[in-house]
């Protein structure tokens, strides 16, 4: 409202306005005075202001990510349910290449289960079909965003990124110029380790997880398909996994993918795999 009436509006980042967070006595009047002093000294840490279109795209894509995550959890639940059944049931299920295809679901619904067990499985598959419908509804929107975004098209050339993840990353980053280098992008995604330093000792802890969790989710989600598709990325991951363990290697791979995203976006080009 303020910007439309000719008044410059600044939105302060609540986690970074340390003067307010540390105050012993907090009242609206005191907070306003502190903000006024910070503004006068040009020390207000601002939140990035997204366009209306970007915020709308965020909501749709994040909702889709929620549905995808819920579907993954539901699939795991179905597999766990079937693993608890008697051997002849498990043998019938094992013959199906995809139990969630139309044919596979018919096989599951035809299993010789106890009445209560059958109802449980029917409820799980009904929920699966509902999630599948909701995800399908966003497909046209994802396609439209992809066709309109050169950045998403560059990102899609990177191993591990399909259309949806490419569009999600492009929308969450929005404007690459707000990141001065790859380290700032890593911090924004929350894939850097926490650091505790005292004297001459420095301890690196778990990742901070304080950044954009959707961007972090997309980068981590792309790790496994990326290392399967790209030889050099696989070598990078396996070398780290041997020395630091699988979890740390996975986070390092997510950082590597974000670095590649930064470079192809900034240079306006497709990803080029190293040729031996």
Regions found by a protein language model. Give the residues of each.
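Short helix-capping/linker segments at secondary-structure and domain boundaries
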Residues: 43-45, 74-78, 136, 174-178, ...
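Low-complexity, acidic/Ser/Thr- and charged residue-rich accessory regions of DNA metabolism proteins
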Residues: 200-201, 236-276
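Short, amphipathic alpha-helical segments that act as regulatory/interfacial helices
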Residues: 36-39, 61-64, 68-71, 75-83, ...
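Residue-level detector of well-ordered alpha-helical segments, enriched
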Residues: 70, 74-77, 165, 181, ...
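Glycine-rich, often acidic, oxyanion-interacting loops/wings at catalytic, nucleic-acid
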Residues: 62-154
């Amino acid at each position: 409202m303020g910007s439309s009436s000719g008044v410059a509006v600044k939105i302060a980042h609540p986690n970074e306005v340390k003067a307010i967070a540390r105050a012993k006595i907090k009242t609206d009047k005191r907070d306003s005075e502190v903000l006024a002093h910070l503004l006068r000294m040009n020390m207000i840490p601002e939140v990035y202001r997204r366009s209306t279109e970007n915020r709308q795209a965020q909501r749709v894509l994040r909702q889709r990510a929620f549905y995808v995550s819920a579907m993954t959890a539901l699939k795991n639940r179905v597999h766990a349910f079937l693993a608890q059944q008697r051997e002849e049931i498990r043998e019938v299920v094992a013959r199906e290449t995809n139990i969630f295809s139309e044919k596979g679901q018919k096989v599951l619904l035809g299993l010789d289960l106890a009445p209560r067990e059958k109802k449980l499985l029917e409820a799980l598959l009904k929920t699966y079909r509902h999630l599948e419908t909701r995800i399908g509804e966003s497909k046209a929107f994802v396609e439209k965003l992809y066709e309109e975004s050169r950045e998403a098209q560059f990102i899609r050339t990177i191993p591990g990124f399909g259309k949806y993840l490419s569009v999600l990353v492009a929308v969450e980053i929005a404007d690459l110029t707000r990141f001065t280098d790859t380290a700032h992008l890593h911090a924004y995604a929350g894939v850097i380790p926490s650091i505790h330093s005292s004297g001459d000792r420095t301890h690196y802890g778990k990742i901070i997880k304080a950044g954009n969790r959707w961007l972090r989710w997309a980068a981590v989600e792309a790790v496994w398909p990326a290392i399967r598709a790209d030889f050099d990325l696989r070598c990078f991951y396996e070398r780290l996994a041997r020395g630091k363990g699988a979890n740390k290697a996975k986070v390092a791979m997510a950082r590597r993918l974000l670095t590649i995203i930064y470079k192809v976006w900034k240079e306006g080009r497709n990803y080029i795999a190293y040729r031996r």
